[in-house]
Amino acid sequence: MMSGRMNAAGDESPFPFGAMQAPGPGAYVGFDHGAAAVAAAAAAAQRAGMLQHHHHHMYDGLDFAAAMQFGGGQDAPPHPQLLALPPSMAAPPPPPMPMPLQMPMTMPMPGDVYPALGIVKREGGGGGQDAAAGRIGLNLGRRTYFSPGDMLAVDRLLMRSRLGGVFGLGFGGAHHQPPRCQAEGCKADLSGAKHYHRRHKVCEYHAKASVVAASGKQQRFCQQCSRFHVLTEFDEAKRSCRKRLAEHNRRRRKPAAAATTAVAAAKDAAAAPVAAGKKPSGGAATSYTGDNKNVVSMSAAKSPISSNTSVISCLPEQGKHAAAAARPTALTLGGAPPHESSAPQIGAMLHHHHHHQQDHMQVSSLVHINGGGGGGSNNILSCSSVCSSALPSTATNGEVSDQNNDNSHNNGGNNNNMHLFEVDFM
């Protein structure tokens, strides 16, 4: 009976307790290793139980467990030793998976390139969502169509341009040649020269040389144009071409001419008032000087007269008219020139009026001087021929104007009364 049950169990499964384990992937860590150990232990127990059953008729725990599985005890919970492995038999956890094995869900197409400093995307030839939609490159939103054949060439161009822009004269500027002199046979390196010489590609020696062989011709470097010209465009040993030198001289002379014109205009403006207010001629000055001398001599002759003497001075009318005719014409500043017919008459009248005022002042001064000497009365009769514009033309020969000037002088208790009579003849 016992043997039949064991045979039935062995026909179904070599491990009768295998079905008792809960199904599910990864239920136990290191399941394969633990299963092999359990199988070996079960086989040894089965052989020991069979020996005990046939020879000693003792109780077999493994056989009881099998009976409970296939008998009426299928609803009982499994034994705890069958669910958990001993700690010594537990396998270590598996190592973490390497990064290359973690592939993304969307694989990049073979046409996609991600260089160090730029990204280039191309239209993929394969199917798929990316191929159908098409990718947009970094070319300002435009589609980039590159075949796999020109991939390396495009990468070189991009890397060269980007490296040259980022590092300056580093990677990109490695192929840049330094500036050299353009004169034949010179080819001097201008890397350490001045900026002017580097810019125009000429060394300092050939920039100042009178004759330079450049481009197969005898030329000279122009300082104004900053380039080479043939020798026929220069004047003798000049370092500037004829055209630019003429322009330079014209620019320099233009301010000088303007300054000269301004100075001449200023001189003319200053000379205009001087010409308008210049002194009278020599004849007029001599005439005025002679008249003043005559007045002074007359006053000197009258000064020693005593207080009791009466003096009458009468000048011939003809002589006065002749002297008036001989006197020059007096001009007034800012006045309009007189007419030719009335010019001598108006000038003579103005001069006579001025002379009359001077005579009157001289006589008055003499009277005051004589009056201060002693007591008595001084009577002076002055006869002069005066032509005045203020007098009427209908005057006769003997218009007499009496002017009585009473001057009271308190000098030593004496009163001096002076009576001045002026007789004007027309």
Curated annotation (Swiss-Prot):
Organism the protein comes from: Oryza sativa subsp. indica
Gene: SPL10
UniProt subcellular location: Nucleus
Any single Gene Ontology cellular-component annotation: nucleus
One term of GO molecular function: zinc ion binding
Domain note: The SBP-type zinc finger is required for the binding to DNA.
PANTHER family assigned to the protein according to its UniProt record, in alphabetical order: SQUAMOSA PROMOTER-BINDING-LIKE PROTEIN 10, SQUAMOSA PROMOTER-BINDING-LIKE PROTEIN 4
Residues where Zn(2+) 1 binds: 181, 186, 203, 206
Reported tissue expression: Expressed in stems, leaf sheaths, and young panicles.
Motif residue range(s): Bipartite nuclear localization signal: 238-254
Protein's name in the database: Squamosa promoter-binding-like protein 10
Binding site for Zn(2+) 2: 222, 225, 229, 241
Bias (Low complexity) ranges: 268-287, 401-417
Keyword vocabulary terms for this entry: DNA-binding, Metal-binding, Nucleus, Transcription, Transcription regulation, Zinc, Zinc-finger
Listed transmembrane segments: none
Summary of the function given for this chain in its UniProt record: Trans-acting factor that binds specifically to the consensus nucleotide sequence 5'-TNCGTACAA-3'.
InterPro entries cross-referenced by the UniProt entry: SBP-like (IPR044817), SBP_dom (IPR004333), SBP_sf (IPR036893)
Stretches for region Disordered: 268-290, 392-426
SBP-type ZnF: 178-255
SUPFAM superfamilies registered for this protein in UniProt: SBT domain
Subcellular location, principal: nucleus
